[in-house]
């Protein structure tokens, strides 16, 4: 079924064509893209690249790994099985039935009963990971696949190392027919993922910045607003709003939505409301409240520019703020580790960390 037309989507067909053209030339079989969240990566992948690939004859399994941080192997099985089904199911089911570890599992029962899309997540990772190769083997030799993995930095987590090695091995032998787009929001993690010798995907895909939206995007949406409203916006007003919102497309659309609803109040009022909404998001408060007091203290210091959170002076400051004795280096390291695994912090240099999400950073720096 075709997706309903979205008049607010700023199509980028030339960029989609460029990425597919690189694969058609045969010089590369994968590409990795990075940009911060909310900058339009997923929109391009889902609304421009995937439809263009489908028109070119690719099957296009897509997975946002941020939705499957605990079960990426099972999620990959689900999207790939949907792409190659039903041809590959019989062999997969035969193999599953022969595995003692899953013979009586609810997951297998669901799969046998035909609930394939829903039940892969019930399999253990040790079962799901080896099945990836079996599914890919069922891909017809002339059928091309574009595998799109969004928030791909999830694969760099230590607990997913076996999956990453297996995926690399399976894709290595199928470069002619399977092309891959990795996209992610953590530049540092992706650089480590593709640039460290010890990582499974070392040198496997060129890593490049995602081309960000700019004045052309702002101009197109400004024209659309002016066709819909009797209170016209000027190009200067919308460009200033775009800059004030960190050149973030998602926030700019919120600003336009507010303006259309209350156009008589003017652009400045719409921008002020949008900034208040963005930087006081209840989800940020929930994230903050979910953190242990020590993690909050460390995060607050890093947000305010403190670099050496392991020094005696800073640890003393942390302890004083918590009404306790200074935590040890090891205790602070554990807090930093939790924040890093939760993708709240990202390491930029040895011992130096930054807040990954700009919106959260601004929220942390606000006056209290």
Q: How should each PLM-predicted stretch be described?
A:
Residues 7-20:
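N-terminal pre-P-loop "Q-motif" helix
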Residues 21-28:
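Phosphate-binding P-loop
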Residues 29-31, 35-39, 43-146, 155, ...:
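P-loop NTPase nucleotide-binding core
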Residues 51, 258, 338:
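Alpha-helical DNA-recognition elements
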Residues 118-186, 195:
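Conserved Walker B catalytic segment
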Residues 192-240:
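Helix-loop-helix "sensor" segment of P-loop NTPases
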Residues 223-284, 293:
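Amphipathic alpha-helical "lid/sensor" segments that cap RecA-like P-loop NTPase cores
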């Amino acid at each position: 079924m075709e997706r309903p037309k979205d008049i607010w989507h700023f199509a980028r067909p030339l960029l989609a064509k460029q990425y597919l053209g690189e694969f058609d030339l045969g010089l590369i079989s994968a590409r990795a893209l990075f940009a911060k969240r909310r900058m339009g990566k997923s929109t391009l992948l889902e609304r421009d690249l995937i439809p263009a690939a489908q028109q070119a004859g690719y099957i296009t399994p897509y997975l946002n790994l941020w939705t499957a941080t605990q079960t990426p192997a099972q999620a990959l099985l689900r999207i790939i099985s949907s792409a190659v089904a039903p041809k590959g199911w019989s062999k997969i089911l035969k193999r599953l039935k022969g595995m003692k570890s899953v013979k009586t599992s609810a997951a297998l029962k669901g799969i046998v009963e035909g609930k394939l899309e829903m039940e892969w997540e019930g399999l253990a990772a040790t079962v799901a990971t080896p099945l990836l190769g079996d599914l890919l083997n069922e891909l017809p030799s002339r059928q091309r696949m574009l595998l799109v993995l969004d928030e791909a930095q999830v694969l760099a987590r230590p607990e997913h190392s076996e999956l990453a090695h297996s995926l690399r091995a399976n894709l290595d032998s199928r470069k002619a027919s399977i092309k891959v787009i990795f996209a992610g929001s953590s530049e540092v993690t992706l650089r480590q993922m593709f640039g460290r010798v010890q990582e499974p995907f070392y040198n496997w895909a060129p890593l490049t910045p995602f081309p960000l939206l700019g004045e052309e995007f702002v101009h197109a949406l400004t024209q659309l607003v002016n066709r819909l409203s009797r209170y016209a916006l000027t190009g200067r007003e919308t460009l200033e709003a775009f800059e004030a919102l960190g050149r973030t497309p998602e926030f700019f659309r919120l600003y336009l939505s507010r303006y259309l609803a209350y156009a008589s109040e003017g652009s400045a009022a719409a921008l002020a409301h949008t900034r208040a909404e963005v930087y006081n998001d209840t989800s940020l408060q929930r994230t903050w409240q979910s953190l242990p007091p020590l993690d909050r203290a460390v995060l607050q210091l890093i947000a305010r520019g403190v670099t050496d959170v392991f020094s005696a002076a800073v640890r003393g400051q942390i302890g004083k703020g918590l009404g306790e004795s200074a935590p040890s280096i090891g205790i602070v390291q554990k807090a930093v580790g939790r924040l890093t695994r939760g993708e709240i912090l990202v390491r930029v240099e040895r011992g130096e960390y930054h807040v990954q999400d700009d919106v959260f950073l601004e929220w942390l720096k606000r006056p209290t």
